[in-house]
Amino acid sequence: MALMTGEQYLESMRKLNMQIYMFGEKIENFVDNPILRPSLNSVKATYDLAQMPEYEDLMTTTSSLTGKKINRFTHLHQSTDDLIKKVKMQRLCGQKTAACFQRCVGMDAFNATFSTTYEIDEQYGTHYHDNFKKFVEYVQDNDLTVDGAMTDPKGDRSLAPHAQADPDLYLHVVERRPDGIVVRGAKAHQTGFSNSHEVIVMPTIAMGPDDKDYAVAVAFACPTDAEGIFLIVGRQSCDTRKLEGSEIDVGNSEFGGTEALVIFDNVFIPNDRIFLNGEYEYAGLLVERFAGYHRQSYGGCKVGVGDVLIGAAALA
């Protein structure tokens, strides 16, 4: 499949059946919702820019797995030059949207999970790395947007996941079956989940052997509209102004970001989408590697938004 255009991205999102709730009601048409649409426009920009010849070198690259042309947001970094182009791409997207364009967490999750699954397989003889490579190829071939979910509600932070009064405060495995696992819990502050085709769920802290049944010691991927997933959209400053049809207090009217509490209510994950399952000693390593990549991402996107603010101030 060729790289999607921005309009093709929007049409692909219309085909998803996500369970999204806002103001106590289910959102039936989230793509055209006035509050949610600016967030989708930010992701759309990453597709539009990839179609422009002047930005091709930053926005696209060659897949290390298939040799095909791909969007750089789905790339597995191969060199220092890749990392430099990554951060320049993020600055460009920040300059073009003056907002969060919501694909950085998924990209950073890709690269952290790729190396971690290799090391788990080396120690335990598992097949997580092959599972993950097949998932990445699927994402690249279909030019999909992938969210990364890390933060659990946590509850009492002085206690480990298994010691919480409510077991659902950390996403955890409630059933192991021959064909996969069933998980329950939530991930909080999920930027871009409602604008993504797939999600990679990762650990949120390091842990010990008593926590191996928790999704904090599990990594997996699933469609964002998988059965049992529900999104509760968080509030933004002046968000209801977008419903009034005026320009007062709207801020950045075209682009924006949304966050959601994502509930996993007994969601089934097949074996070929599992990348870590109870190997608790690798939970902290995966978190640490993700954090390193993600700190670099902030050095690009926030600088791009800063460029816009500096320019606006200069014109004021």
Predicted regions and their residues:
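Acidic/polar, glycine-rich intrinsically disordered N-terminal extensions of enzymes
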Residues: 1-61
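Structural beta-strand/beta-sheet cores of well-ordered domains, especially the beta-sheet scaffolds
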Residues: 18, 144-146, 179, 197-199, ...
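Internal helix-loop-helix
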Residues: 48-146, 198
